[in-house]
UniProtKB/Swiss-Prot annotation:
The lineage of its organism: Bacteria, Bacillati, Actinomycetota, Actinomycetes, Mycobacteriales. It comes from Mycolicibacterium smegmatis (strain ATCC 700084 / mc(2)155). One of its GO terms (cellular component) is cytoplasm. Keywords: Cytoplasm, Schiff base, Thiamine biosynthesis, Transferase. Homotetramer. Forms heterodimers with either ThiH or ThiS. Belongs to the ThiG family. Pathway: Cofactor biosynthesis; thiamine diphosphate biosynthesis. One of its GO terms (biological process) is thiamine diphosphate biosynthetic process. InterPro entries: Aldolase_TIM, Thiazole_synthase_ThiG, ThiG. The keyword Transferase applies. This is Thiazole synthase. It is an enzyme of class 2 (transferase).
């Protein structure tokens, strides 16, 4: 049986599905979806949360016993991302951070230069850094060499639901990585999540695929099952693809 435990930066999680909180119509629906997903780690965009009041999303995660993963979503440069991460560490008491440094609001693609700069500073400052990155094997290797605890390549741009645009690059990142690979962004439905795991990813992070679905709790349950199925399939080993048919029963 495949190992169901996700290990990142010395921490262990019983689910390989990491959830995001953006896009939910209200906290009640978000709560139902989080419970249905079985997630043990969920991102929180710190620029959009009032941490001091202890209300809203952070209070919900605390009540459900789900670890909060602060996120530097919306940051446009290394300095802004580093400051946001430092404030999150003060507010939440965790050194784990999902590092996002975006290039522009239209594509929400990572700014590779600023991302590397921010990652270097945060690793030096003792953070456990999980960077949201392009599906670029060279950049992923660079982030690992810096000391990031995982790499989180996108499947396709945030919120597009286009699935995994370049599965070959994801496979190359997985093959070269010595740290966990988390497919982050672009998931549209359960088959996308299963494919990410079949390609060898250690986990999947998604938000709007669930929070903006017609029935978020049901989609969350589907995603959880898909991640488990994809992980099991990867561990089991698929049969090779063949050009010609091959009978499954021997000739008598």
């Amino acid at each position: 049986m495949a190992d169901s435990v996700l290990r990142i930066g010395g921490r262990e999680f019983g689910s390989r599905l990491i959830m995001g909180t953006g896009g939910a119509p209200n906290l009640s629906v978000l709560e139902e979806a989080l419970i249905a997903s079985g997630t043990e780690l969920t991102t929180v965009a710190m620029r959009r949360v009032d941490a001091e009041t202890g209300t809203g999303v952070l209070d919900l995660l605390n009540r459900l016993g789900i670890a909060a993963l602060p996120n530097t979503a919306g940051c446009r440069g290394a300095a802004e991302a580093v400051l946001t991460a430092q404030l999150a560490r003060e507010a939440l008491g965790t050194d784990m951070v999902k590092l996002e440094v975006i290039a522009d609001e239209r594509t929400l693609l990572p700014d590779a230069v600023e991302l590397v700069k921010a990652a270097e500073q945060l690793v030096d400052d003792g953070f456990t850094v999980l960077p949201y990155t392009n599906d670029d094997p060279v950049l992923a290797r660079r982030l690992e060499d810096i000391g990031c605890a995982a790499v989180m390549p996108l499947g396709s741009p945030i919120g597009t639901g286009l699935g995994i645009s370049n599965p070959h690059n994801i496979e190359m990142i997985v093959a070269a990585a010595g740290v966990p690979v988390v497919l982050d962004a672009g998931i549209g439905t359960a088959s996308d999540a299963a494919l990410a795991m079949e390609l060898g990813c250690d986990a999947v992070l998604l938000a709007t695929a669930v929070t903006r679905a017609s029935d978020p709790p049901t989609m969350a349950a589907a995603m959880a099952s898909a991640v488990t199925a994809g992980h099991l399939a990867r561990q089991a080993g698929r049969i090779p693809k063949r050009f010609w048919a091959q009978a499954s029963s021997p000739a008598l």
